[in-house]
């Protein structure tokens, strides 16, 4: 075993775990047993995996680990939203947010430390991009949150029956652009869908993208889950300013990709997310332009009141203006919702996932600040 690379079993989806067990001389069914222990029973070590042969447990010791997130903080908002801040090393942290509702519980999962897309209205992009998260770091957010929430409710670990599951929906809408970390995100989502792990349906796992068109096509071919697109502007000139990726994949190309995706998607519509910015993209004329640009894509709109942060120079649209904008869309027969701001008192609201621990080098480069780790009070 000397010199062997230690494997984090959270990094392995079902196929990867079968291959790993095979490398140890074990049969494929052992992979399912391991997967259930890790993802359904929250096993922290191998000794407690009582239906595994002792010889296999001994093989795993020293060769494999079950990685667990390094939680820096755990905060609960007045509205019940819960945010965990997770250390991912080198002065970086990512955030995981649970949003409880009457009939469901939604977990917002991060895929990168920082983000390279740098949307103008999103605080995460202002810290720059540090690195991609691993599969284990992504699915580990779901594992950590599910069992922490169960513990708070007095529910024991075990198979994820509908009556016991706390997290019913996962949205890949946290820090980062998921499709720019495709090789780690897709295995993580496979585990979310796997009946030997979390057993979520494809309709209940949503990936949000700013519009990485080639990877949208690949996702549709390999693992079509529900799709949300961060749109935020009704024309290329404005979207170029708000979502710089638009310069590479403009609206016509993006709309065509949405049409292709719908041919294989588990839902018959795309959700378009639209951050409402006062005097920038929120007029009734913008709404009519938005209807025109999306007319060939079955869709619904989710209007998001902007959550201000100092570096943006932007202001949230007034409530009445958001309602007028929404009414134009509704009058055209398009399902439109206005997102209720949740968790903003703990900086967990949409667009606020900047991480309280910031990469020292990038922070210094961007602000000229001294090289310290900055921790923001929450």
Swiss-Prot record:
* Name the UniProt record assigns to this protein: Dual-specificity RNA methyltransferase RlmN
Free-text cofactor note: Binds 1 [4Fe-4S] cluster. The cluster is coordinated with 3 cysteines and an exchangeable S-adenosyl-L-methionine.
What is the role of the protein in this entry? Specifically methylates position 2 of adenine 2503 in 23S rRNA and position 2 of adenine 37 in tRNAs. m2A2503 modification seems to play a crucial role in the proofreading step occurring at the peptidyl transferase center and thus would serve to optimize ribosomal fidelity.
- According to its UniProt entry, this protein's organism is Burkholderia mallei (strain ATCC 23344)
The Radical SAM core domain covers 101-345
GO biological processes: rRNA base methylation; tRNA methylation
Q: Which residues of this UniProt protein bind [4Fe-4S] cluster?
A: 115, 119, 122
UniProt xrefs under SUPFAM superfamilies: Radical SAM enzymes (SSF102114)
Q: What is its EC number?
A: 2.1.1.192
Keyword entries, A-Z:
4Fe-4S, Cytoplasm, Disulfide bond, Iron, Iron-sulfur, Metal-binding, Methyltransferase, rRNA processing, S-adenosyl-L-methionine, Transferase, tRNA processing
What reaction does this catalyse?
adenosine(2503) in 23S rRNA + 2 reduced [2Fe-2S]-[ferredoxin] + 2 S-adenosyl-L-methionine = 2-methyladenosine(2503) in 23S rRNA + 5'-deoxyadenosine + L-methionine + 2 oxidized [2Fe-2S]-[ferredoxin] + S-adenosyl-L-homocysteine; adenosine(37) in tRNA + 2 reduced [2Fe-2S]-[ferredoxin] + 2 S-adenosyl-L-methionine = 2-methyladenosine(37) in tRNA + 5'-deoxyadenosine + L-methionine + 2 oxidized [2Fe-2S]-[ferredoxin] + S-adenosyl-L-homocysteine
Per the record, its GO cellular-component terms are: cytoplasm
Concerning Pfam families, the annotation shows:
Radical_SAM (PF04055), RlmN_N (PF21016)
InterPro entries the UniProt entry points to: Aldolase_TIM (IPR013785), Methyltransferase_A (IPR040072), RlmN_N (IPR048641), RNA_MTrfase_RlmN (IPR027492), rRNA_lsu_MTrfase_RlmN/Cfr (IPR004383), rSAM (IPR007197)
What are the disulfide bonds?
A: 108-350
Q: Where does this protein hold S-adenosyl-L-methionine?
A: 176-177, 208, 230-232, 307
**Compartments (UniProt record):** Cytoplasm
Any one Gene Ontology MF annotation carried by this entry is: rRNA (adenine(2503)-C2-)-methyltransferase activity
């Amino acid at each position: 075993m000397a010199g062997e690379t230690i494997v984090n079993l959270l990094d392995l989806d079902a196929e990867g775990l079968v291959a790993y067990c095979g490398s140890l001389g074990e049969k494929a069914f052992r992979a399912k047993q391991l997967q259930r222990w890790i993802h359904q029973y929250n096993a922290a070590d191998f000794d407690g995996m009582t239906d595994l042969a002792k010889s296999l447990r001994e093989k795993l010791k020293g060769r494999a680990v079950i990685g667990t997130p390094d939680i820096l903080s755990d905060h609960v908002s007045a509205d019940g939203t819960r945010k965990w801040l997770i250390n991912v090393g080198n002065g970086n942290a990512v955030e995981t947010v649970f949003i409880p509702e009457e009939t469901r519980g939604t977990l917002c999962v991060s895929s990168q430390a920082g983000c390279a897309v740098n949307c103008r209205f999103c605080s995460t992009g202002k810290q720059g991009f540090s690195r991609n998260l691993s599969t284990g770091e992504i699915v580990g957010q779901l594992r950590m949150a599910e069992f922490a929430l169960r513990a708070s409710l007095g529910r024991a670990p075990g198979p994820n029956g509908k009556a016991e599951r706390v997290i019913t929906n996962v949205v890949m809408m946290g820090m980062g652009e998921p499709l720019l970390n495709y090789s780690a995100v897709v295995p993580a989502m496979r585990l979310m869908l796997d009946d030997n792990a979390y057993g979520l349906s494809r309709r209940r796992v949503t990936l949000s993208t700013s519009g990485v068109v080639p990877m949208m096509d690949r996702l549709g071919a390999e693992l079509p889950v529900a799709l949300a697109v961060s749109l935020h502007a009704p024309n290329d000139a404005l979207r170029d300013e708000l979502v710089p990726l638009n310069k590479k994949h403009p609206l016509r190309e993006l709309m065509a990709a949405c049409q292709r995706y719908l041919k294989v998607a588990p839902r018959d519509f795309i959700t378009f997310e639209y951050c409402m910015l006062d005097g920038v993209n929120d007029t009734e004329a913008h709404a009519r332009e938005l209807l025109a640009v999306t007319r060939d894509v079955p869709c619904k709109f989710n209007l998001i009141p902007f959550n201000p942060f100092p570096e943006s120079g932007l202001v949230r649209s007034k409530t009445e203006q958001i309602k007028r904008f929404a009414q134009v869309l509704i009058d055209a027969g398009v399902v439109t919702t206005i997102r209720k701001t949740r968790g903003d008192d703990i900086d967990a609201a949409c667009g606020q996932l900047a991480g309280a621990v910031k990469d020292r080098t990038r922070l210094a480069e961007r602000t000229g600040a001294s090289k310290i780790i900055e921790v923001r009070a929450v």
